[in-house]
Amino acid sequence: MTQIDRLRALGFALFGDLWQSPLARELGVADRTVRRWIRSDTAIPADVWPRLAAIADRRLELLQTARAAL
């Protein structure tokens, strides 16, 4: 799996079909930046991966809390 594949898979898992804008907001980057990564116009910076892991952890915690309330 390439880095772009990983980014797409995680973006979709976190935010659904329209994942690019919400992911960009969470990372504090422009939507265009995410699109450039996907097109391989610019490399995905190494610091993005730990930031994505932290975003996934926060969203997982929110989901678990919501699930527990059911």
Range-by-range predicted roles:
Residues 60-70:
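Short, charged recognition helix plus adjacent turn
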Residues 40-54:
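Short, basic-rich loop-to-helix N-cap that marks the start of a DNA-contacting helix
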Residues 17-35:
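Short alpha-helical DNA-recognition segment
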Residues 1-16, 50:
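A short, Lys/Arg-rich alpha-helix, primarily the initiator
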Residues 9-10, 14, 21, 38, ...:
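Residue-level detection of beta-strand scaffold positions
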Residues 27, 38, 52-53, 67:
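A general structural motif at alpha-helix termini
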Residues 1-3, 27-31, 54:
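Coiled-coil-like amphipathic alpha-helices with heptad-repeat character
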